[in-house]
Amino acid sequence: MERRNAWLSYTEAEEKELEQVAKAYRNFLNVGKTERECVTQIIREARAAGYESLEEKTAKGEKLKAGDKVYTVGMKKIIALFHIGQDDISEGMNILGAHIDSPRLDVKQNPLYEDTDLAYLDTHYYGGVKKYQWVTLPLAIHGVVVKKDGSTAEVNIGEDEDDPIVYITDLLIHLAGKQMQKKAAEVIEGENLDILIGSRPLKDLEDDKKKEAVKQNVLNILKEKYDMEEEDFLSAELEIVPAGKARECGLDRSMIAAYGQDDRVCAYTSLLAMLGMDTPKHTSCCLFTDKEEIGSVGATGMQSRFFENAVAELLDAMGCYSDLRLRRTLKNSSMLSSDVSAGYDPAYGEAFEKKNAAYLGRGIVLNKFTGARGKSGSNDANAEYVARVRNIFDSHEVAFQTAELGKVDVGGGGTIAYIAALYGMEVIDSGVAVLSMHAPWEVTSKADVYEAYKAYKAFLLDA
């Protein structure tokens, strides 16, 4: 059942559309390197497509009807879009669910220190990372600083050409004999992922401050640019991410290399499919969650009540809320958990079982189950639902493939699918194959990005 490379089937018109999708996607990656930035961009694009704030419409007492398009946001890190359909919503929604957080380094609450005339920010890594991949790279600082008076300063350092970047050092090879004998997990330890941010001491300091003259200079710069004091780090969310824009990859420009493609490749293609919809038969929903990389925990993760509460508010705004109707709406819904899959890498072929692996360029990937070992932590989609999704994709000429996440007992991973399935709805993982997943720079195929967009659009129309 080997799948054909999707590139071989495209017409000239399809290739043109593919390139347009890929270009728009790269722009999304450039402006959305944190979950907050992604939510901001999603709102911007949704409003341009006619979406309105659910809270604003509710405050005005406006009732929702078929064709209305609304969104609701939680803590600036999670967002749901709804396009009201023609059928009774209790018959179920067609849902696309992606996550917009990605592995990174988070600045600690008390991070700034100086050592031998070098200033550093202490960090704590977020999500599953190979720590050694994060050293000796140009890095940027993104995030917010919230002061005691409630005012917020948005931080973005390292992306403009004139911006400085920050950096994590590594031991020079000439002195690394002992280091090179360590296991990969220990070569760079978590406490050594400290960000080099300065080396110029401030002049004319009082004697008691001369020992930390470089740190004082950094604080002066932060005060001048963001009006922040050192204490304001306590209420800051600063994320260290790779600096630089998404790039076309390969001499044939067939791929995209960028930070955060897990899972923003599925988030953006889901968004694009959602925004291009005419009034659907079934109500469409696009959900973008936070905290997936650390277990979907917290108030902005999928395990929170955000989604359930959002649907309840939607029903109330439609004038048809009841607890039973809410439960029926969720139970009768169909969902694609829009999350990435491990792309087969011939350089590491021993980690994959080739018949059940995802290949770049062969279309969107269906993962009937994920999890680890004996499918632990998995959502295992029903065969009837897999057949229905297959039929939808085939009817719309979507290139797709099926895969597992590597060989049995080699590793594993999870998504938000099993959490959504707790409502009794049908869910299957469906996303794009990625090379070097969770690395600072990941690689996807433009063809797979395009097929994901087509797949999500087909699902919203016909599921």
Model-assigned labels for residue ranges:
Residues 1-463:
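N-terminal hydrophobic/helix-forming segments and targeting peptides
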